Amino acid sequence: MVLDRYARFADSADVLSCPLCHSALKLQEGSLVCPKRHCFDIAKQGYVNLLGPSRQSAHYSKESFESRMAILEAGYYDHVKEAVLTAVGRALSPSEGPAAVNATPFRVLDAGCGEGFYARAIRENLCVDVVAFDLSKDAMLMAARHDSRKAVKWLVGDLTNIPVLKGSINCVVDVFAPSNYDEFKRVLTPTRNASAPGVLVKVVPGSNHLTELRHLAEGSLRSKEYSNQLVTDCFEKHFKMTDRIKVTRTFEMSERDVRVFAEMTPLLFGIDAESLILSRVKSITIEAELLVGTPRSQGPS
């Protein structure tokens, strides 16, 4: 009998690849092993380190992920989560129906998943298989511990060498994280609806995201205003935009939660939060844009 923490990796040979030789990884007792005998143990918490020695940024410490988790679980990003679920659901819907019953599971990859908030939501709300990775071991420890269903394949992995087989993913989700479009195109496969290509759902900050904190710290920032145009242009160079959705909400917020936001947001990395009069901030705007697209075989025509 396969232990619960191992069961989610039973079909690893269909999706996971060795980071050293890129061949398929197969579950053998409590480890993932490739044909060349490279072996990666499954941690008791339920994740696998497919990276080696972690080189995470000091900005993304265990404490920063705990702060992020507190904010996410408080509901401030629920409107973003719901939009992501809708976008992934639309990618999934063409494959539903009697013809898909015995087909390969619809697989979603959460790239740069952090503490796993979105990956867990996708797995809990949609009938899909979820693989999620992050460069941070601390993040994966937290993600795996909060995965009560023991259903997501959690990996410590590198965006420049995603430990996933070519063409094994139907939908890549990238929420407020860096992108590697060449790797995304490599892992994406046509969906189960004939020749329909795989889908990328990339979530980026909107122009009004955290505008209250931006105004408070404007004297210390390179730019008083934010635009995601460069990110959007790069997206469209590699993926054909099929949808673009903006979601925004402004929340009244306690001084404690404002301080947690200030500590966790990359906007204020390198700025001494103690130098800011955070008590002036009574509300914070959470605005995101979802860029949804399919891979371009070449540059835009």
Residue ranges of predicted features:
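A short glycine-rich, Lys/Arg-flanked "PGG" loop and its adjoining helix->strand segment in the class I
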Residues: Y181-V199
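Conserved class I S-adenosyl-L-methionine
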Residues: V199-T232
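Conserved Class I S-adenosyl-L-methionine
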Residues: A13-D14, K246-S301
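Class I SAM-dependent methyltransferase Rossmann-like catalytic core
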Residues: S57-V80
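N-terminal auxiliary segments of SAM/dcSAM-dependent transferases
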Residues: M1-A58
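A short acidic, Gly/Pro-enriched loop at the edge of an enzyme's catalytic core
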Residues: T160-C171
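Class I SAM-dependent methyltransferase SAM/SAH-binding core
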Residues: R107-N161
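A short SAM/SAH-binding and catalytic strip from SAM-dependent methyltransferases
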Residues: I169-E183, V204
